[in-house]
């Protein structure tokens, strides 16, 4: 159906507040509904006493799936149990209709997942306590692919971040800061992606992949007001880390992290929007994450 001749209408959330609903949006109806729902939820939390009409524009553009599927190839930390899917029922019932049901088990930290601040910082947000507005926002992508290709133990530095800002401007408050190392190209080859395909505690010392330098993590806490960080490797700390200092620093400031991010090569350095919604595990240190990017329109 062609809606090109239909004007945009405001959808009222409550008196004095509206969202602009664009009928000729390029997004499918289900995604338009999702964005309206999310904006209502965020607005209800952040705007207690609106005094005048406001129009909120939600992102329009191509949707990029930034999560890997869970299956027997999913990459987990060497000491974590993997993904398991058991069939409870699959087939036609005695009544004649088709029915499927499965029981799945997974560690919190495997595949594309959330690291909640409580994972490395006592008393900070658990998975179910992270404010939703911290899990969505404008995406800033710092590309360190060249450095990571030259050294798979590359520590992402303040200089790497400053080089990005020199070209694209300062990282804005509320951004989702994503580091693109290029390691996503190796998924799900554990040896290429992690540095080893071995499992167990002894395999941890064999891990080799890039991560955030603790000095860069501290600089971000001190100088930028970001919502979250993410990376296309198994951890925001590099593979050879033994103290996981970048986790400690960022999580100490209640900044959550997204690990094993997929399709980061699809996002531009600036202009995209990210929504990253984890499984709501009460008291959880993390959990499976469904993450999407919305590319800017041309």
Residue ranges and their predicted role:
Residues 46-298:
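Active-/binding-site microenvironments in catalytic and ligand-binding cores
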Residues 31-37:
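Sec-dependent signal peptide recognition
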């Amino acid at each position: 159906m062609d809606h090109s001749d239909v004007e945009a209408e405001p959808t009222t959330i409550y008196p004095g507040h509206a969202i602009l609903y664009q009928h000729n949006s390029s997004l499918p109806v289900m995604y338009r509904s999702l964005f309206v729902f999310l904006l209502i939820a965020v607005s209800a939390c952040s705007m207690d006493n609106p005094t005048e009409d406001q129009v909120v524009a939600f992102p329009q553009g191509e949707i990029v799936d930034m999560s890997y599927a869970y299956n027997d190839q999913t990459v987990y930390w060497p000491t974590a149990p993997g993904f398991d899917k058991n069939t409870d029922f699959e087939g036609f019932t005695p009544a004649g209709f088709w029915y499927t049901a499965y029981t799945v088990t997974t560690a919190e930290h495997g595949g594309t997942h959330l690291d909640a601040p409580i994972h490395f910082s006592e008393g900070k947000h658990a998975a179910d306590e992270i404010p939703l507005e911290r899990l969505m926002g404008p995406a800033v992508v710092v590309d360190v692919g060249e450095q990571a290709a030259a050294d798979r133990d590359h520590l992402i530095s303040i200089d790497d971040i400053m080089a990005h800002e020199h070209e694209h401007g300062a990282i804005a408050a509320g951004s989702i800061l994503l580091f693109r190392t290029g390691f996503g190209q190796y998924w799900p080859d554990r040896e290429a992606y992690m540095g080893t395909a071995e499992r167990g505690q002894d395999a941890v010392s064999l891990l080799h992949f890039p991560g955030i330098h603790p000095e860069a993590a501290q600089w971000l806490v001190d100088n930028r007001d970001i919502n979250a960080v993410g990376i296309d490797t198994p951890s925001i700390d590099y593979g050879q880390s033994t103290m996981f200092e970048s986790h400690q620093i960022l999580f100490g400031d209640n900044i959550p992290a997204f690990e094993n991010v997929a399709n980061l090569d699809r996002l531009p350095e600036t202009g995209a929007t990210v929504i990253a919604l984890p499984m709501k595990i009460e008291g959880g240190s993390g959990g499976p994450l469904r993450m999407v990017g919305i590319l800017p329109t041309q």
